[in-house]
Swiss-Prot record:
Taxonomic placement: Viruses, Monodnaviria, Shotokuvirae, Cressdnaviricota, Repensiviricetes
Membrane topology note: Peripheral membrane protein
Keywords: DNA-binding, Host cell membrane, Host endoplasmic reticulum, Host membrane, Host microsome, Membrane, Phosphoprotein, Transport, Viral movement protein
One biological process term in Gene Ontology: transport of virus in host, cell to cell
Protein name, entry field: Movement protein BC1
Any one Gene Ontology molecular-function term assigned to this protein's record: DNA binding
Organism, as annotated: Tomato golden mosaic virus (strain Yellow vein) (TGMV)
Compartment(s): Host cell membrane; Host microsome membrane; Host endoplasmic reticulum membrane
GO CC entries: host cell endoplasmic reticulum membrane; host cell plasma membrane; membrane
Subunit structure: Binds to dimeric supercoiled plasmid DNA.
The UniProt record lists the keyword DNA-binding: yes
UniProt PTM: Phosphorylated.
Predominant cellular place of this UniProt entry's protein: host cell
Amino acid sequence: MDSQLACPPNVFNYIESNRDEYQLSHDLTEIILQFPSTASQLSARLSRSCMKIDHCVIEFRQQVPINATGSVVVEIHDKRMTDNESLQASWTFPVRCNIDLHYFSSSFFSLKDPIPWKLYYKVCDSNVHQRTHFAKFKGKLKLSTAKHSVDIPFRAPTVKILSKQFTDKDVDFSHVGYGKWDRKMIRSASTSTIGLTGPIELRPGESWASRSTIGPSPSYAGSDQGDAMHPYKHLNRLGTTILDPGESASIIGAERTQSNITMSMVQLNEIVRATVQECINTNCTPSQPKTLQ
């Protein structure tokens, strides 16, 4: 497969690393890239510039027997991200395939931080012993600086296959997608009146069901996000009998308590007798006898 690059690499514009041998490993192992010198980085830092990778070329040259099997995985990571989100681009290709990998950066980085990009490789499902020096890697970097970052048009990674026995059907490569973003509403007087962060205020002639249909944006209408934020927004289409919640929990609990009281006739007679006796003792006092003078 021919390279899809518009401009082939020019060695005079690229910083080249040494073509070094690397041992076969089933775990991710770093490929050392040559970055600008400390003096160059300091000069760019003093000029308050930021930097990006315009183009990165990773050359892979295999040195294994013709019956060697397995796949090589090469990954570029951005260490500004968390470990599980740092992967930016990856390639897979046969271990016997001589190939050039091409990568284009989509972001700037500050020279006040360490250079964030790291390059790794590993070999999967191979019949070659581990720690065998199975290939040579060489990196070429073209970087640029700017006074401030700007939007960079996305350019997909690509490859140039140099071994004639392999085609584009034997390789694969990918790039990470754009990060997802959800709008966060700001708490204000307007948001408190539409029921997002404050209670819904019912006005004359309105019901809870109709007021709860108010959302932050018409774009949420009919969407899963809108349904999640306003699960009762369609209640106003139901009749009042369906919306009636029925008796409260306290009334139901009281009725259950009353219905569970059981008493025998002897206990009931004893309560009545004690009650009557108490009333007599309290309200019925005997009159004092009159004496004759």
